[in-house]
Amino acid sequence: MKFPMNNKKMTTKKRGQYGELLAADYLTAHGLNIVAKNVYSRYGEIDLIAQDDRVLVFVEVRLRRAQALVSAAESITPEKLRRCYQSAQDYLQKNYAVPPDCRFDAVLITQYQTHHEIEWLKNVIF
C-alpha cells in the first residue's frame, strides 16, 4: 500500500491504514514480530499487537501532519490509554490461560510534505 505523502484528499481511514503499515514495518525492522492488526473489543481497537522476545506489546499508532494543531503524542489522551488497557485485558482473557508479560507502546508518525518521522515510545502506560 503506497500513498503520496502530501495527498490531502486521503480519507481518515486510508491515512490510518498507511500509518499502521509504516508502524508495522518500523517495528519489524527493529526486531518485533507483528502478531495481530486492528483487534477490536467492546472497549475499542488495538492497532497492532507485537511480540518482543517474551513480551507481548500492544501498540497505539498515531499519524499527524506536521501542520496539525495537536501533535501525535498529544492526541493520546488519558481516556484513550484507559480504553487501550481495557482492550488489552479483554484480548488477554480471550487468548491466554496465563497472560504473558506485556507492555504498551506508541508509534508516533509526523507526516511532512516530502517525508515522515517516526518516534517509538515504549511503556507508555503504567
UniProtKB/Swiss-Prot annotation:
CDD domains: PoNe_Nuclease. Pfam families: UPF0102. GO terms for molecular function: nucleic acid binding. It comes from the Bacteria. Belongs to the UPF0102 family. This is UPF0102 protein DNO_0639. It comes from Dichelobacter nodosus (strain VCS1703A).
